[in-house]
Amino acid sequence: MTQAICSACGKPAKALDWTCRSCHASLNLQALPPFDASAINRGDFSLWRYRAMLPVARRFSLGGGMTPLVPVEIAGGRFLAKLEHLNPTGSFKDRGTAVMLNHLADNGATDVIDNSSGNAGASLAAYAGAAGLSATVYVPAATAVESKKQLIRAFGGAIIESHDYLADVYAAAESATYASHAWNPYFVLGQQTAAWETWEQLGGRAPDAVATPVGHGGLFLGFYQGFKALREAGLIETIPRMIAVQSAGVDPVVRGWAAGSKRPPKVKPAPSLADGILVDAPVRGEQILSALHDSDGLALRVENEAILASQKAMHRAGHIIEATSAVPAAALPRIRELIGDEAELVIALTGSGLKSLAAR
């Protein structure tokens, strides 16, 4: 039976826990069902086609997942884009939220909370509405985008703006269920479905490399763990080289990788266009660095100027993505230099730019 356990001390957690009650470390899932290709429900064109590999009782769905995988060419090179910004609320967060909230609702949660700069909050509010739960989102008063706050409210979520929103949400978690996109292991489990879809869309094989923006690293780890499950099932030989790309404004993973550390250092945030990955201390930082080592991966940083140029190039290529989503493509010239022009590269386009365009 699948069980959440502490990543540090190994103690089991309760169903609604978001962190270890003993040592306050993050939680991992153990005894997950092995990946079974014969169990895929090929008539379900959502992430729930992998229901046999997702040990939660499905109660509701907004149809997230099964996003297109399409070729893109911009200055700097070619790649395959996984269009995660086409999920129901406009970001990859819907994968993790769908699995996490089905788990929490099945275990008695009624009031859920999270802290978010926008996308995770919109996703939580939408899926909570579908589940009949109430959702409250703590947003940073100084940086939250107005259009994203409007989206959270449109989905029925309540908003609390705070200058210390992390401290406030941790305090609120004493009485409400903390449905955290950073801490909850079921959120990361939901992200594995992106890897499984990519494998299917490529005809039952893995690409040579996968690049994502990295803040807390939920999608990055989901891709890594998803491909790891495929390797353990004997369906691929090698996990793709995982490429973590961060803004030069907040780049703890890049610094930890460059230093050969097991844990990213805490950094002082600097201004960045990539507001969705302004994370100075990733909850699963050690796991991200471990995944980089295991996959012979790369960790790269990009400047604001490159992010803006990449976003504009992607817009002209037909993909309206937000600045955070443009971070990996901003590193494309360097990625191609390191992995070669012929390597098959998948880049996740993580969030829609329509939300930010509406705010201009």
What residue ranges belong to the model's regions?
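PLP-dependent amino-acid enzyme catalytic core
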Residues: M1-R360
